[in-house]
């Protein structure tokens, strides 16, 4: 039986009403423009698109637009994303829903596709980031008034606009609002069945040469190579969450609340951030499964849900309601004034972007954190705070510090260009979602962190050794791969 399950109205925003059509009248297809939530299962936007199609007896398709160098993403991020999409393409085919990959400026490709297929409805993902919102606004303007456009927040457990209608000051101010709505939104997903009506047109555009596309993207973005520690795709994400071998909830959960802030115990972390960032796993699925095992480790589950739901959704809130989410202008007034009062304070060291990027500072702990990010694609969460605060201490002023931290985060982190990444930099450097602390040079009233504090918290030498070993192994692997590539391009010919 085809899916007829409706999504809660509070999860949907109507961006354009479109023309009313009688139920017995043939209408155009429903198109789901996927971008932030790249999965088949547990996807409210796809569920809504199929439901719309079934209620209007129309076919449904999924389109994904590949932006040209979106926010300077490199092989590391694009390779991971495209390999996940390749898997998704095959999975969606099993439901007899066509998947179309478009390339270019979405402001042009999406309206053109909608016109060509005669769509009646467009369903889109939600993102708080300005580039996506501007693009979506243009798509709304450039499409026919007869087309209905619905935006679905399938990324957050509680939809961003339902959780709060304003910029929240801290986790404390949004936590109660989210928890109050969890009974309404933290519910099990319905099973997604094939749509009633099959898609028949434009099948020539459905073919995607994934191997060639991935090879091209990886080659062009080789400055930041792919990583091996996390396998892309929806299946891999679920395995990391709850696999029998090394799943977070099944094997590693009990140490989360006690060890998650210890950089020499990276296995205590969930390892889910790449999958959550690309939408290959639903945060709601993670929360549902975590609740099932709460009796075994209540403190660990509660801590995990705080990070997974409250902190992540606070980041979306900030990026949506604060247009200057990546600028000193976005800091609270007390923090901005304090930082500017101390902007001209003498710094012990001033490092260039190149020195910072290569980890060439006088602080071996900071260098290790930077190299962990460069070579592993994931800096430990505790070290991210120390890392960003030291950039504030070692650059000419807070604006430069924020700019450099965001640039490096977006370039090297597998989950870069995420609201949580922007907010992490803003918290560390600009005191966003934090309070004022004892005033001191350079930092003003921004929370201070130093080497001695880290040394009291964990074994600094062990962390530095761990990163050195990681870098050495990674370099050897890359050198061997590069030699293999050279040999395949220019093989040595033996004359007998």
UniProtKB/Swiss-Prot annotation:
Pfam families: DNA_photolyase. Disruption phenotype: No visible phenotype under white light, but inhibition of growth and leaf necrosis under white light and UV-B. Increased accumulation of CPDs under UV-B. The record marks 366, 387, 394 as: Electron transfer via tryptophanyl radical. Keywords: DNA damage, DNA repair, DNA-binding, FAD, Flavoprotein, Lyase, Nucleotide-binding, Nucleus. Induction: By high-fluence white light, UV-A and UV-B. It is found in: Nucleus. GO terms for cellular component: nucleus. FAD binds at residues 256, 269-273, 307-315, 415-417. One of its GO terms (biological process) is photoreactive repair. GO terms for molecular function: deoxyribodipyrimidine photo-lyase activity; DNA binding; DNA photolyase activity; FAD binding. Gene3D superfamilies: 1.25.40.80, DNA Cyclobutane Dipyrimidine Photolyase, subunit A, domain 3 (1.10.579.10), HUPs (3.40.50.620). Highly expressed in flowers. Expressed in roots and stems. It catalyses: cyclobutadipyrimidine (in DNA) = 2 pyrimidine residues (in DNA). The keyword DNA damage applies. DNA binds at residue 307. Its cofactor is FAD. Its main location: nucleus. Involved in repair of UV radiation-induced DNA damage. Catalyzes the light-dependent monomerization (300-600 nm) of cyclobutylpyrimidine dimers (CPDs), which are formed between adjacent bases on the same DNA strand upon exposure to ultraviolet radiation. Required for plant survival in the presence of UV-B light. Not involved in the repair of (6-4) photoproducts. This is Deoxyribodipyrimidine photo-lyase. The gene is PHR1.
């Amino acid at each position: 039986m085809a899916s007829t399950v409706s999504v809660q109205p509070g999860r949907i925003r109507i961006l354009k009403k479109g023309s009313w059509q009688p139920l017995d009248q043939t209408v155009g297809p429903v198109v789901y423009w996927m971008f932030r939530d790249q999965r088949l299962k547990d996807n409210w936007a796809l569920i809504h698109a199929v439901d719309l199609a079934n209620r209007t007896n129309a076919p449904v398709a999924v389109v994904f637009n590949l932006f040209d160098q979106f926010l300077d993403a490199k092989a590391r991020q694009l390779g991971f994303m495209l390999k996940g999409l390749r898997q998704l393409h095959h999975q969606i085919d099993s439901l007899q829903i066509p998947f179309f990959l478009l390339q270019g400026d979405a402001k042009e490709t999406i309206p053109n596709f909608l016109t060509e297929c005669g769509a009646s409805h467009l369903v889109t993902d939600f993102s708080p980031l300005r580039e996506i919102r501007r693009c979506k606004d243009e798509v709304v303007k450039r499409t026919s008034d007869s087309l209905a456009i619905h935006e679905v927040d399938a990324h957050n457990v509680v939809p961003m606009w339902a959780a709060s209608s304003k910029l929240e000051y801290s986790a404390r101010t949004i936590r109660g609002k989210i928890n109050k709505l969890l009974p309404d939104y933290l519910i099990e997903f319905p099973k997604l069945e094939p749509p009633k009506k099959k898609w028949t047109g434009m099948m020539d555009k459905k073919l995607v040469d994934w191997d060639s596309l991935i090879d091209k993207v990886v080659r062009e973005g080789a400055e930041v190579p792919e990583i091996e520690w996390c396998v892309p795709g929806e299946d891999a994400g679920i395995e990391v969450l709850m696999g029998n071998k090394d799943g977070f909830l099944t094997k590693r959960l009990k140490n989360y609340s006690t060890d998650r802030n210890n950089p020499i115990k990276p296995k205590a972390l969930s390892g889910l951030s790449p999958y959550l960032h690309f939408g290959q796993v639903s945060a709601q699925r993670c929360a549902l499964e975590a609740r099932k095992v709460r009796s075994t480790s209540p403190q660990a589950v509660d801590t995990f849900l705080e990070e997974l739901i409250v902190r992540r959704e606070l980041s979306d809130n900030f990026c949506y309601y604060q247009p200057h989410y990546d600028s000193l202008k976005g800091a609270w007034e007390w923090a901005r004034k304090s930082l500017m009062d101390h902007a001209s304070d003498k710094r012990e060291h001033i490092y260039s972007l190149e020195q910072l990027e290569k980890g060439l500072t006088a602080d071996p702990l900071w260098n290790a954190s930077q190299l962990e990010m460069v070579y592993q694609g994931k800096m430990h969460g505790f070290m991210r705070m120390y890392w960003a605060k030291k950039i504030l201490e070692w650059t000419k002023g807070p604006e430069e510090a924020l700019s450099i931290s965001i640039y490096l985060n977006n370039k090297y982190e597998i989950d870069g260009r995420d609201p949580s990444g922007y907010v992490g930099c803003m918290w560390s450097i600009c005191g966003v979602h934090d309070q004022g602390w004892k005033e001191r040079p350079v930092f003003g009233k921004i929370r201070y962190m130093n080497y001695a504090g880290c040394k009291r918290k964990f074994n600094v030498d062990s962390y530095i050794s761990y990163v050195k070993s990681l870098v050495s192994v990674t370099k050897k692997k890359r050198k061997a791969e590069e030699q293999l590539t050279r040999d395949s391009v220019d093989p040595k010919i033996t004359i007998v």
